[in-house]
Amino acid sequence: VPAIVDVTTGAVVNNDYHALTTELALGFKDFISPDAPDIYPEELRADIDALNVIIYADFNLAVNLAALVTNQKDYEYYYDRIFARLDWLEERLSKQRYLMGDTITDPDIRIFPTLARFDLVFYQKYLVNKKRLVDYPNLWNYAKDLYSNPAFGGTTDFDSMRKRFYYVDHTPFEDLPRLIPKGPDDSVWLEPNDRAEKFSK
C-alpha cells in the first residue's frame, strides 16, 4: 500500500491511496520539478476524478477480486468487467496519447502498476486470461510509453513483482506451488512505442 511516512518518527502520515496522488499534486507543488506535468489540472479535475473511479472499480480492484472470489459466477462477472474495460481503454487510447489527452495526469499514474503486473501476474496467476496486455496495440504501446518515462520505468521492478505475487503472496492459492516464473520476457517493455509519433502535433 503506498503511504507517506515521516522519516524521523516512522509514523504513517497518509495511506489513503485514493487521495494520495492528488494530495501530493496539490499540497507539494513547491517540491515538484517545474518541468513535471500538472497531474491534476483544475479544469480536468471532475473528469479525472470520474475516470479514477472507473479505473479503480473496473480494473485495479477488479483484477484482485477476480482472484479472491469463491465461485464461478463471481469470477466470470469480474473477468467480463475487466475485459470490457480494457476494450474501452483500447478504444480511448486510439484517439489520444494519454488517458486524459496529450499529457500525463493522475489516471495514468494510477493505472500503470496494474498494467505493469497484468501479463506477469494477473493473466497467469489470477486467471484473468482472455487477452494479454500485449494483445491490445494501443494499450500496450501506451504502457510502454509510460514505462519509457523514468518516473515509471525507474521505479518498476518486475523481479520484485514476481517474488511478491508468486512466492510471498498470501492470496488463496495454497494448492499451487510457490514457484517464481521465469517469464514473461521483461525486455519487451524496452521496445519502442509509437505514442509520441502517433499523437505529435
Question: Model-found features: residue ranges?
Answer:
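C-terminal alpha-helical interaction module
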Residues: 1-201
